[in-house]
Every structure is written in C-alpha cells, then in structure tokens.
C-alpha cells in the first residue's frame, strides 16, 4: 500500500529533483521548495553545461572513486545504480550517451534537458521557486514542518537537499547545513574540493593557458607520496588546474597545503637513464644548436622558452658547452620539476564541497537522521564526495532517490 505522507523537499537541484520524483512515485504528496529562480541551477554548469550526469561503471568501481565515506553509499547505489539512473533518465524522455571515461551525457548535450525531464515527471506536485526556507520545525524529536517567510508549512517529512557551499553563485550557500546544525547534527569541516591550486613560483603564471598532456603529477606530504597520477594539467594566472590537479585537490582536500610538495614528471614514459640517453642523443645530432632550440623537441615551445632558467643553464649554450652537471640539472628538472602550493582556490571555484553532515548521524539504509525523526538528507550536504566524471552527480541522484522513497514510506513502516 502506497504512502500518503506530505514530504517537503528543500532544494531543487539534482538531489532534490530525484528525491521529489521518487517520493512522488512512492505515493507521497510532494512540495519542493527552491530559493533560486529556477530548478537545477547548478546542473546547468556541470560538464561545461552538458551535464555529466553519471559514470557508466559498476558499483564497486564507482566506490573506488569516492574519496570520503564510500561505504555509506552502498544502500543508495543499490537503490539507484549508475545503470538504473541511465535507464531512468532515458525513460523520462532524455536520451543519454556514453563518452570517453564512461562519462554519461544527454544526447542533446544540454543540461537543461535533464532537469526538464525530472520536472516533467513531477507534474501535479507542488514545485515552487523563489521559495526561501528559514528552518525546520521539530516537536518531540519529530519533524512537523518547515518555516517560510510568512508561515509554517506543516508536513510529515523533510528532505534537506540544499547542496554544500561550492559555487555559491548557484545558490549553494550552506542553508541546509545551518538547519542541520540547529537540529543538533554535526557538520564536519568544510573544504573546497575538485578545485585549482595556487602556486608560489612565478613560472607557471608565465605559461598561463598552456595545457600539458601525458605528464605525471606527484604530491608528497611529509615525504610520503599521497598522489601520483598521469594525465593532463593546465597552467593558469594563479597556478595550476586541469583534471590531474582537480583529482589531487580531492585526495588532499583535508591536508595542510604547506606540508605538500608537488613535482612534475614531464617525461613519465622514460626512466631517468633513458631520458639522459635521449638528451645526449639530441645533443649529438645537433651539436651547433643552442639549448633553447633543442628543447622544443622535448617540450611545448612555450615551456621550452623558460625551461633553461628553471635549470639555471644558459639558453644560448651549445651541447659541447653544457657541462655534465648542467645536463644532470636539465634531465632532473624534466623528471622532477618542483612546485610549491600556497593553497587551494576558494569555494567559488570548487566543483564540490568536502565535508558536510556527519554520516555517523544518518542511517545509510534510509538516509533519515538518527537525531530527528522524519528528517532526511541527500546530495552534497552529506560528508561524501568523489572525483570528477559524473560520480558526484550520481551521488546526488542516488541519495535523493533513496531519501525520497524513504521519506514517503517511513511512517507507514513504523506503524506496520
């Protein structure tokens, strides 16, 4: 027998839309309250506006890409797996496709089609924009409603799906986290994750806009390697960004950046000895060329221009003039070019928030609060975050779906 609970969902992003749909399908009367002027505002900027809505991998692979509290997500991913989400979105009238790295996008390449598909599935329910919630009303340890500007809206269950504090321009200003604290929940330290890094040295800024491919980025904390991956990186006006850097920022989101030592291996396919032999060969094949004219065979031209200074070698020297010590510095810098991190960029540029409502205080099988009956959490509000590639949106959709279904049914199950 289906429930007839009145479920209020605070937040109309990916988690809120999913919660509303699954609560509705479980028989609940749904009111979704979004303080922005439209639903799914953050969805519109995900995947560069194309909405990388999930990753077409199995659950075990998925969990390996979750950085904090992956096991907490087992129930949510069993309820709505990546395969289930693709099927759901297709059934809602938004065909999907799988691209490089198993990233799933709408065929149209328009994020708006994803949010529209969910909204079309919610016809007949109360969906309100420009609706700011001031707090959650609780009596005797049980949710009784939400406080609006002008009144109390009574309900049987509340799902907080207001997001974290990343990209605050999209409305993610931490409202739900404040409500959670007011209700006695622990909110772990919040840090920006999947975010560019600021570098002390000046030379990365000289290379602003240059993208390096097939390089290896290594990070050590107190001389212990914590991250070592190959891929792509981008130099910016403040430091570094790109896929490798965003992943690194996720792995070390809780670290003190002053303890982190970064290094670039510009030729990871070659060992130190192989690279030294390659440099010697290049020198031997062009004995009259200056160093600055030899380096473009090894590096992008813009980087080749500044590289001699990084090695403290005169760029006009010919191979015969380069000492063994200087050649060693050149090879050493190609294999291990150090950078000093001064910090991560702020929440304004972070893809996701590291930290949130402590999962120790939330029941993973239902996503209901262990402190307040009828209070549920979904999405980025929870202390769970993952790498790029559709993983964080999947977390939002899956936790939203489970919370929505649980909120619709929880009183019925208690009375059974």
Task: Set out the residue ranges of the language-model regions.
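N-terminal Rossmann-like FAD-binding beta1-loop-alpha1 element of flavoenzymes
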Residues: 6-32, 403-408
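Short hydrophobic core segments
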Residues: 8-10, 33, 133, 153-168, ...
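Glycine-rich FAD pyrophosphate-binding loop
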Residues: 24-48
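An anion/pyrophosphate-binding glycine-rich loop and adjacent beta-alpha core
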Residues: 37-39, 44-45, 59-60, 186-191, ...
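Glycine-rich active-site loop/strand segments that organize a redox cofactor
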Residues: 50-98
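Feature captures the FAD/FMN-dependent oxidoreductase FAD-binding
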Residues: 78-157
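A glycine-rich dinucleotide-binding beta-alpha-beta segment and adjacent secondary-structure elements
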Residues: 129, 135, 305-385
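Glycine-rich loop(s) and the adjacent beta-strand/alpha-helix scaffold that form part
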Residues: 157-203
């Amino acid at each position: 027998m289906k429930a007839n609970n009145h479920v209020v969902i605070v937040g109309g992003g990916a988690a809120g839309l999913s919660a509303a749909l699954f609560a509705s399908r479980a028989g609940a009367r749904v009111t979704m309250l979004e303080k922005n002027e439209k639903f799914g505002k953050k969805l519109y900027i995900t995947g560069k506006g194309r909405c990388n809505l999930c990753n077409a991998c199995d659950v075990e692979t998925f969990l390996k890409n979750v950085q904090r509290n992956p096991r907490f997500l087992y129930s949510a991913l069993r309820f709505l797996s990546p395969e289930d989400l693709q099927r759901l979105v297709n059934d809602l009238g938004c065909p999907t496709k799988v691209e490089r790295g198993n990233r799933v996008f709408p065929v149209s390449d328009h994020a708006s089609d994803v949010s529209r598909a969910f909204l079309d599935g919610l016809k007949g329910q109360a969906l309100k924009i420009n609706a700011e919630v001031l707090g959650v009303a609780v009596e005797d340890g049980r949710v009784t409603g939400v406080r609006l500007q002008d009144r109390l809206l009574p309900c049987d269950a509340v799902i907080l799906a207001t997001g974290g504090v990343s990209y605050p321009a999209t409305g993610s200003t931490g409202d739900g986290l404040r409500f959670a604290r007011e209700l006695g929940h622990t909110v772990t330290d919040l840090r920006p994750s999947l975010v560019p890094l600021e570098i002390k040295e000046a030379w990365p800024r000289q290379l602003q806009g240059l993208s390096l491919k097939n390089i290896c980025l290594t990070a050590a904390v107190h001389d212990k390697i914590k991250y070592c991956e190959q891929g792509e990186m981008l130099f910016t006006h403040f430091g570094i960004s790109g896929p490798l850097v965003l992943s690194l920022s996720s792995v070390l989101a809780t670290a003190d950046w002053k303890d982190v030592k970064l290094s670039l291996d510009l030729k990871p396919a070659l060992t130190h000895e192989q690279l030294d032999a390659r440099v010697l060969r290049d020198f031997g094949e062009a004995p009259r060329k200056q160093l600055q004219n030899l380096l473009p065979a090894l590096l992008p031209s813009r980087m080749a221009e500044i590289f001699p200074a990084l090695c403290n070698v005169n760029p006009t020297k010919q191979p015969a003039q380069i000492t063994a010590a200087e050649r060693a510095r050149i090879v050493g810098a190609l294999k291990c070019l150090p950078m000093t991190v001064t910090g991560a960029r702020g929440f304004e540029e972070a893809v996701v928030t590291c930290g949130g409502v402590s999962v120790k205080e939330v029941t993973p099988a239902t996503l209901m609060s262990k402190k307040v009956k009828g209070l549920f959490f979904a999405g980025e509000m929870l202390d769970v975050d993952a790498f790029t590639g559709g993983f964080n949106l999947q977390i939002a959709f899956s936790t939203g779906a489970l919370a929505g279904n649980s909120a619709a049914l929880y009183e019925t199950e208690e009375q059974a």
